[in-house]
């Protein structure tokens, strides 16, 4: 078996991982169960049961890559990894289209975010050996970029016309099925708020739901990594709820990963609202996987990747416009019609059986059993310089305050 180096950009030690952190925790578990020796690098050297752990640093990249057969990286940490690590067959996880998500921060942070995202993505596409994505839309998006960088080239195409040796689908997964508890509350969960969501619309939706179901509530959760995840929309939602004096809107801490099932089981239904954009076309809402795992029917704005799942498994309702009343009517219908509610929970259970992590990560498991360098990248790919992000004024101030 292989010695696998997982390079996770998010802290894991606090036990409250978000999407990227959750994915790395589950990747570690699956590869460990396959018999691999797994070492996880993260900003805080957070532990994953059965795996060794260390901090992200230039020194750890150099030292641990020498002793590894394969590496898995995601996001901006790839810049430092490719700059300081010994060459090792590397899987780049592209399930999170961060360059598109972060366009929402233009007004707040200007061009710097896009420039750094672009540099990161182009460098990773050129230097990675194998790539993972979460949907067919993502696969085509990244293949287009790979043509531009030379990674999709005639030599590779002649050998592998379907490009499966270059990029494969490995969507999010869920943990083992769990029994569903009887549910009689009217509490609605939104979860964490990112700046591409529309939490104010969700508040208005539940305000309308309360005209028919007076005890309905809405809960948002605070992100566990606010220092690296802008919280503009969360602040907007808090201000809006205070202005309206809505006591049915709650803002609670992010649930610990090991305890999230018990937390989700308090709710009857999940709600997601967001505007339609390229981000929704490419995204795979990872929380939807967790909500289905816990049997929550879902009412959501339209995002093609997850729309298809909810429709296929009859596990939720997709609203294709921005109308508050349409979202509210769907929620009232599900909560009042027990047959509909139960059918959606049954569909969610079928989804869980078919989306276990060991199944969704099959392409990664195959690569780790036989790691390899992709030699055509040396012949066709452009080679942009690797540049680590210079510290911003805010970074320097934070370090000075900690000193």
Which ranges hold each PLM region?
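N-terminal subdomain of nucleotide-sugar transferases
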Residues: 1-45, 201, 208-211, 391-403
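Active-site proximal beta-strand in glycosyltransferases
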Residues: 4, 85-108, 113-115, 125, ...
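Conserved donor-binding/catalytic core segment of Leloir-type glycosyltransferases
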Residues: 5-8, 171-198, 202-210, 218-222, ...
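Membrane-proximal helix-turn-helix segments that form the acceptor-binding/catalytic region
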Residues: 111-131, 139, 155-161
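C-terminal amphipathic helix plus adjacent low-complexity
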Residues: 162-163, 350-403
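Nucleotide-sugar-dependent
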Residues: 197, 256-263, 270-290, 300-308
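Nucleotide-activated donor-binding/catalytic signature segment of Leloir-type glycosyltransferases, i.e.
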Residues: 222-224, 231-264
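Conserved acidic donor-binding segment of nucleotide-sugar-dependent glycosyltransferases
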Residues: 312-313, 317-324, 333-338
